[in-house]
Every structure is written in structure tokens, then in C-alpha cells.
């Protein structure tokens, strides 16, 4: 089987990671104790168990154990996961934690405190990987604004890549926003992390607290959304994005196939996820949605989990995952209509850049749903926002002594800043590129070659 090792780091990473395990355990019929309860229909049972090995190991007495590693620099988060409803699901040796915490300092997570803990984490990752028949890759949930998730999370990514250079690395990264800020130095932590992710990951889903809050206020009409509400939205998206990996299907059935379809240039692997229909926790969707409504909602800027407007950029590639009993023909027609009506929002130099998959099993409580993964040049808005905040502080060298005190060099900040600005320019370059530009690029290349 094509197994995935899941790693969750830091408080945010552990909270969204645990919520993800709750939701997929429910979809696969796995109880909080790890036991499988037989599906009502035999067909459903086969679908639930056919690819269960992608995320679970089968333990003794027929129990299923998540192939997960839970990491934090302080024990608090682990205690709350253990005490939670699904705490019994994880093996005790999957928890790796320090005692100190990293006090919102990226350098502590990446160079000092985190570096001391990283070997114990790699041991657990190694053990889990060795038990796999055919490991396809790793997925990491973390936030970029905190410390353990950003500093230690990116350290883990680079260490794992050293050992498993040919496996796929996917991250679900929560990007900080000024509206929902825990600490002043979030722009520093995020910029230093993105500097690492650009080079070291194959796919990064950008989840944005600002977008999640907007969805809670505008769409779900929640007056005081909690982190629980935000995590609920994230876990819906994660469940949707991983549907093709967990259930039998043809399209994007493993991480590498998804990467090949979605990433036209290696650095441009930051995706904008979306979900439809959006529902609040605990509420049931009473009105059944039609496929046209789902498709419309899915492409709507208000449904995006990253705070950027796709209408300000162009889609390089798109993957859509529909779930529930529906007509494939209708899905294809609707997707075709969207592309035709909005052709200016899709780059014309990648033909067939929208891929659609359909899975029969809908999420709990819904008749049908759709998950959207877009590689859009509009994601540069998100990087610009972080970059502006970074520059404002870095120009005054504010808070820098906390980082240099842990052995970091100012040069690393300058490099991270310019790498992020380069990323923004690359997105801009491909946003403006047209199919006719190709000939010009080739001619330039030939001329340069002559002068070499």
C-alpha cells in the first residue's frame, strides 16, 4: 500500500491535526478506541477499508492506529490531546515533547530547543516509515506564526528530506494574519518559515486565519468564532483534500500524481484550498445542493481558505474533488462551463489545467460536497501582506536581539526577505505571461547563448 506518515507540530498543528484524525476516523468507521465498526452496507465497508493503510497501521486485536507523530516543545498540548475524546487512538510512543516551550522565538524552534528534540522525533518517524510497504510521503500540519510549528516544523521538513530525498513532502500551513494575532513577531516567524518551505516542500496548502474568520462572520454568521470553529473549517478542507488518497479513485490517487498535476514550476507549489457547502459546527445542511450550486460556491472567493481573491490573479492549475452520489456528466459540464465563462482567469498556456475527481462517499452530515485546490498567482497577495509587516519591523531591527541571541545571523533575515520577494515576482511573471510570449523567451535564450 502507498502509506503516508502524518506529523503534527506545535499547538496549532496538533489541534488541526487531531481534528483531522477525528473526521477521517469517523469517515472510515473507526471508533475512538481504534476498533472498526462494520458499515451498514457491505459496499461501504469495502470502500472504507480498501485504502485504510494509507493513514492507519493495523495493530493487534484488529485495532487501527493512526500513522502519526505528535510533536511539541511543551507538554501542555499533548496532555489536552490525550485527554480529548480521541486521545486513546494514538500510540503512546507517537508523542514527542520537550519541557521548555520556545517562547515565540523561531530561532529556538529551529536552532536550539527544537534542534535538541529533533533527533527523538526523527527516531519515531524512522520507525513508522520502516513499517511501511511503500511509503509515498509525509504530511505536516503546523502554523507559520508560532514557534514549534514554524521553527521546528521547518527543521523537521529539511531533516526528513535529507533521509528520504525521493519521497513527497506536503504541508498544511496556517499563515498568520494581523486580525488574529497571538504575537508581535509572527511576520518574522512566517517569513523565515516560507523561506524554508519554498525550497523544501513539494506541496503546501496555505490556510489563512483571516480567511477562516471572514467565513465564520460572513457566511456562517457566527458572532464570536472560537479556534474550535476555525479548526472545524480546516479539518473539513483537509478531509476533502485527502479524499482521493483515502478512497479508491482514478484521479490524483497519490501525492506524487497530485503534485505532477498541480505544480508547473517547482517553487510555485503554494495552493489555495476551498470547500463547499460551508456549514457551522453542529448545524445540519437542510437544503440539498445541486452540482451547479456546488461548483459556483467552490470557485467563489468567499469560500477560499486563504485570504486572497482569485479574481486578482490567474489559475495555473486547479483540482476539484466532488463527494457524494452525483452524475459525472453533470460535474464535467459544470466545470467546463466555469472555465469557458471565466477563461481570462485561467492561463491559456497550460491547456486542460483543471482536473476533477468524484468520490461516492460524502462527508458526515452532507449529501454532497466539493473541495477545491487552486494554484493561483493571486496567492502572492498573502506573501505580500506578510512581507510588508516583516519589512516594517526589520527596517527598525525591532525584536531582532531575541533571534540573534540564539545564534541567528541578520543575513538570514535578509535572505528570507529576498526569497519571498522573488517568489512574489515569479507569480507575477506567470500571471502576465501569455501563450505568445513563448517565442520571445526562446529568442532571448538563443541570443544569450551566443554571447556566452
Swiss-Prot record:
The keyword Cytoplasm applies. Keywords: Cytoplasm, Cytoskeleton, GTP-binding, Magnesium, Metal-binding, Microtubule, Nucleotide-binding. PROSITE patterns: TUBULIN_B_AUTOREG. The keyword Glycoprotein does not apply. One of its GO terms (biological process) is microtubule-based process. Its cofactor is Mg(2+). GO terms for molecular function: GTP binding; GTPase activity; metal ion binding; structural constituent of cytoskeleton. The lineage of its organism: Eukaryota, Metazoa, Ecdysozoa, Arthropoda, Crustacea. Pfam families: Tubulin, Tubulin_C. SMART domains: Tubulin, Tubulin_C. Dimer of alpha and beta chains. A typical microtubule is a hollow water-filled tube with an outer diameter of 25 nm and an inner diameter of 15 nM. Alpha-beta heterodimers associate head-to-tail to form protofilaments running lengthwise along the microtubule wall with the beta-tubulin subunit facing the microtubule plus end conferring a structural polarity. Microtubules usually have 13 protofilaments but different protofilament numbers can be found in some organisms and specialized cells. It comes from Homarus americanus (American lobster). Belongs to the tubulin family. Residues 434-452 have a biased composition (Acidic residues). Residues 431-452 are annotated as: Disordered. Its main location: cytoplasm. This is Tubulin beta-2 chain. Tubulin is the major constituent of microtubules, a cylinder consisting of laterally associated linear protofilaments composed of alpha- and beta-tubulin heterodimers. Microtubules grow by the addition of GTP-tubulin dimers to the microtubule end, where a stabilizing cap forms. Below the cap, tubulin dimers are in GDP-bound state, owing to GTPase activity of alpha-tubulin. InterPro entries: Beta-tubulin_BS (IPR013838), Beta_tubulin (IPR002453), Tub_FtsZ_C (IPR008280), Tubulin (IPR000217), Tubulin/FtsZ-like_C (IPR037103), Tubulin/FtsZ_2-layer-sand-dom (IPR018316), Tubulin/FtsZ_GTPase_sf (IPR036525), Tubulin_C (IPR023123). Mg(2+) binds at residue 74. One of its GO terms (cellular component) is cytoplasm. GTP binds at residues 11, 74, 143, 147-149, 209, 231. PANTHER family: TUBULIN. It is found in: Cytoplasm, Cytoskeleton.
Amino acid at each position: 500500500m502507498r502509506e503516508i506518515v502524518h506529523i503534527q507540530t506545535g499547538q496549532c498543528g496538533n489541534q488541526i491535526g487531531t481534528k483531522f484524525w477525528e473526521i477521517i476516523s469517523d469517515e472510515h468507521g473507526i471508533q475512538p478506541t481504534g476498533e472498526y465498526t462494520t458499515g451498514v452496507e457491505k459496499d461501504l465497508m469495502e470502500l472504507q477499508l480498501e485504502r485504510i493503510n494509507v493513514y492507519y497501521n493495523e495493530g493487534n486485536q484488529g485495532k487501527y492506529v493512526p500513522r502519526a507523530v505528535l510533536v511539541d516543545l511543551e507538554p501542555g498540548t499533548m496532555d489536552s490531546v490525550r485527554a480529548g475524546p480521541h486521545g486513546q487512538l494514538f500510540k503512546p510512543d507517537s508523542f514527542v515533547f520537550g519541557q521548555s516551550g520556545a517562547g515565540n522565538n523561531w530561532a529556538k524552534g529551529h536552532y536550539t530547543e527544537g534542534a535538541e528534540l529533533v533527533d527523538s522525533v526523527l527516531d519515531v518517524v524512522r520507525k513508522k516509515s520502516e513499517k511501511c510497504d511503500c511509503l509515498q510521503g509525509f504530511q505536516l500540519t503546523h502554523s507559520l506564526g508560532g514557534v514549534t510549528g514554524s521553527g521546528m516544523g521547518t527543521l523537521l521538513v529539511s531533516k526528513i528530506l535529507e533521509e528520504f530525498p525521493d519521497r513527497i513532502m506536503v504541508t498544511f500551513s496556517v499563515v498568520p494574519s494581523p486580525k488574529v494575532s497571538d504575537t508581535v513577531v509572527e511576520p518574522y516567524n512566517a517569513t523565515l518559515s516560507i523561506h524554508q518551505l519554498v525550497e523544501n516542500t513539494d506541496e503546501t496548502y496555505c490556510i489563512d486565519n483571516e480567511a477562516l474568520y471572514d467565513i465564520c462572520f460572513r457566511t456562517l454568521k457566527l458572532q464570536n468564532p472560537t479556534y474550535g470553529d476555525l479548526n472545524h473549517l480546516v479539518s473539513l478542507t483537509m478531509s476533502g483534500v485527502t479524499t482521493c488518497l483515502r478512497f479508491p479513485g482514478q484521479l490524483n490517487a497519490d501525492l506524487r500524481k497530485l503534485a505532477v498535476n498541480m505544480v508547473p514550476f517547482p517553487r510555485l507549489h503554494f495552493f489555495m484550498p476551498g470547500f463547499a457547502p460551508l456549514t457551522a459546527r453542529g448545524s445540519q445542511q437542510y437544503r440539498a445542493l445541486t452540482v451547479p450550486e456546488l461548483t459556483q460556491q467552490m470557485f467563489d472567493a468567499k469560500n477560499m481558505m486563504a485570504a486572497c481573491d482569485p479574481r486578482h490573479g490567474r489559475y495555473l492549475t486547479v483540482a476539484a474533488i466532488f463527494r457524494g452520489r452525483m452524475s459525472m456528466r453533470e460535474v464535467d459540464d459544470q466545470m467546463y462551463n466555469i472555465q469557458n465563462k471565466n477563461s481570462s482567469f485561467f492561463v491559456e498556456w497550460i491547456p486542460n489545467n483543471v482536473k476533477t475527481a468524484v468520490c461516492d462517499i460524502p462527508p458526515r452530515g452532507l449529501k454532497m460536497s466539493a473541495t477545491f485546490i487552486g494554484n493561483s498567482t493571486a496567492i502572492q497577495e498573502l506573501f505580500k501582506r506578510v512581507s510588508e509587516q516583516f519589512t516594517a519591523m526589520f527596517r527598525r531591527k525591532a525584536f531582532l536581539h531575541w533571534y540573534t541571541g540564539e545564534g541567528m545571523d541578520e543575513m538570514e533575515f535578509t535572505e528570507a526577505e529576498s526569497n519571498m520577494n522573488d517568489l512574489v515576482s515569479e507569480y507575477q511573471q506567470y500571471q502576465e505571461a501569455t501563450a505568445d510570449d513563448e517565442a520571445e523567451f526562446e529568442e532571448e535564450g538563443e541570443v544569450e547563448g551566443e554571447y556566452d
